[in-house]
Curated annotation (Swiss-Prot):
Annotated transmembrane regions: 9-26
Record's protein name: Uncharacterized 3.8 kDa protein in ycf12-psaM intergenic region
Compartments, as annotated in UniProt: Plastid, Chloroplast membrane
Cellular compartments per GO CC: chloroplast membrane
Keywords: Chloroplast, Membrane, Plastid, Transmembrane, Transmembrane helix
Main subcellular location: plastid
Membrane topology label: Single-pass membrane protein
């Protein structure tokens, strides 16, 4: 159960980082 939670947490972090970098890139373009 702990492993599954850790995997989900890691996935959420990856998604957040991806969105953050995409948003930063968008801001740099304009």
């Amino acid at each position: 159960m702990e492993l599954i939670l850790n995997k989900e947490y890691r996935l959420v972090i990856i998604v957040l980082i991806s969105v953050y970098y995409r948003y930063r890139f968008f801001l740099l373009l304009f």
